[in-house]
């Protein structure tokens, strides 16, 4: 359930989800497929002021999740899906303030603590940007950009990622993933800029790799030979 799927006017959070649940069923639930346990949560929390919501998991859902996972053996693979991310990229973190509490889950520490005994992957979205964030050795968040790009106004999301979707494959309890740009082959994974075509990058080669994470080691090759390890930085594409 996303922030555009709820009623954003009324007097309470409970009223904001009623229409969605009347048509589609519960806004949080779980199921098993193979060796993986999947959980869907709703962290779009309407606070009773028209069009104002925050990223927040109510205590009712957290208690339900604790009960649900009590049937899942520790060490199992768990995939948790919700809309507003529980982590921020470095760029988004610099922008975070109380007035932007709808950008990330405000009480994420409680969720992360519940997931600690498991090999957990979080799938989220909302920001129209892409980043992968290792939270701990056993918890990894995938923030997936929008299929609509810049709200159907352009082919790129706000960080330069082409509009598209995440592809996840599961083998037993092992999860693999990659980003797939709409209308592009699976190996289309970056935009490359150099100083010849882009004067602002004179003396540099810049690679915007959409599905990378902070632990990636990116090596540049030229004419079949290594030109060195590329330095990671945060910027807008």
Where are these regions (language model features)?
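Outer-membrane beta-barrel proteins
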Residues: 91, 188, 229-231
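Extended active-site neighborhood of metal-dependent phosphoesterases/phosphodiesterases
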Residues: 1-74, 93-123, 129-171, 175-178
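Binuclear metal-dependent phosphoesterase catalytic core
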Residues: 139-225
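Cofactor-binding loop segments of dinucleotide-utilizing enzymes, especially the Rossmann-like FAD-
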Residues: 2, 43, 83, 212, ...
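Solvent-exposed serine/threonine-rich low-complexity stretches and specific carbohydrate-binding patches
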Residues: 226-237
